[in-house]
């Protein structure tokens, strides 16, 4: 099972090595605006799932939202510590 920290480490490694075929690398290459649109899309899907589709589907959408948030963190140079100090 992945944790927030292990996912961030995995995505950071893919970004640093520019791993061929990586969706993360592709998303980072498309830039902040594209990543932001993905975050908004997944946030909306999370809300709809919570309203109408149950806990399992909501958790799935939340995991996708977390993924795109972490890609944005990498894009903007934001660390886990930056997030933790603001919780």
From Swiss-Prot:
Q: Which family does the similarity line name?
A: Belongs to the PRA-PH family.
**Substrates-to-products reaction catalysed:** 1-(5-phospho-beta-D-ribosyl)-ATP + H2O = 1-(5-phospho-beta-D-ribosyl)-5'-AMP + diphosphate + H(+)
Q: Which NCBIfam families match?
A: histidine_hisI, PRK00400.1-1
Listed pathway(s): Amino-acid biosynthesis; L-histidine biosynthesis; L-histidine from 5-phospho-alpha-D-ribose 1-diphosphate: step 2/9
Q: What is its EC number?
A: 3.6.1.31
UniProt keyword annotation of tRNA processing present: no
Q: What Gene Ontology molecular-function terms does this entry list?
A: ATP binding; phosphoribosyl-ATP diphosphatase activity
InterPro entries given in the database record: HisE (IPR008179), PRib-ATP_PPHydrolase-like (IPR021130)
Keywords attached to this entry? Amino-acid biosynthesis, ATP-binding, Cytoplasm, Histidine biosynthesis, Hydrolase, Nucleotide-binding
| GO biological-process terms attached to the record | L-histidine biosynthetic process
What name is this protein filed under?
Phosphoribosyl-ATP pyrophosphatase
One Pfam match, given by its short name, reads PRA-PH
* Keyword match Lyase: no
Q: Which organism is it from?
A: Bifidobacterium adolescentis (strain ATCC 15703 / DSM 20083 / NCTC 11814 / E194a)
> What is the primary gene name for this protein?
hisE
GO CC annotations?
A: cytoplasm
Where, per UniProt, does this protein localize? Cytoplasm
């Amino acid at each position: 099972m992945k944790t927030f920290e292990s996912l961030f480490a995995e995505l950071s490694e893919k970004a640093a090595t520019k791993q061929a075929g990586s969706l993360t690398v592709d998303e980072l290459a498309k830039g902040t605006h594209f990543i932001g649109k993905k975050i908004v899309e997944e946030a909306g899907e999370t809300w709809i799932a919570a309203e109408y589709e149950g806990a399992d589907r909501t958790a799935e959408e939340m995991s996708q939202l977390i993924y795109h948030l972490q890609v944005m963190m990498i894009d903007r140079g934001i660390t886990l510590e930056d997030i933790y100090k603001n919780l």
